[in-house]
Amino acid sequence: MRLFGLILAGGEGRRMGGTDKASLTLGGRPLVTWVAERLGPQVEELAISANGDPARFAGLGLPVLRDEHPQGPLSGVLAGLRWAAAAGADALVTAPVDTPFVPGDLAPRLWLAGEGACAVAEAGGRVHPACGLWPVAVAEDLAAWLAAGEARVMGFAARHGAARAGFPDENAFLNLNAPEDLARAESLLRKDA
């Protein structure tokens, strides 16, 4: 099994005042670094899905994939699937840039839950579909889904009967969507220190 990884960093950060969430800092380090350090060791290759100037990620040494037609996170997933398929990967594991506490065993647990098919993360009674595993074989169906105007990640996951991989830590998928979420994450860091 060849798993590739993708950090979804294409959002506009509207609830963060239009700030690029990838460059927001937590514990003095950019969010993109947190996710790269957690997801990178779990996959064979890692890339970032982002629009705008790719130079802002130059220090990470990772490929930056652009959306063909920006329609939300699934556009990034499609770019990642095509990149992974071209390199001979079996599946793509995705995590948003604003989930700095993504588990160190995300990829293997998603693979086991879905037995190689689509799978999404679940913690604290909530499903986190952007933290998912997507076989490269679903790329063309995803392209058709987006072309039909569909854009919901959970809708596409349900279309493919995505399994759910349960995680015990409800903070593992804490999304930093607003300033108060960032403050909560800083508090969790201090508590764990």
Curated annotation (Swiss-Prot):
GO terms for molecular function: GTP binding; metal ion binding; molybdenum cofactor guanylyltransferase activity. Its cofactor is Mg(2+). GO terms for cellular component: cytoplasm. It catalyses: Mo-molybdopterin + GTP + H(+) = Mo-molybdopterin guanine dinucleotide + diphosphate. It is an enzyme of class 2 (transferase). It is found in: Cytoplasm. Pfam families: NTP_transf_3. Mg(2+) binds at residue 98. The N-terminal domain determines nucleotide recognition and specific binding, while the C-terminal domain determines the specific binding to the target protein. This is Molybdenum cofactor guanylyltransferase. It comes from Cereibacter sphaeroides (Rhodobacter sphaeroides).
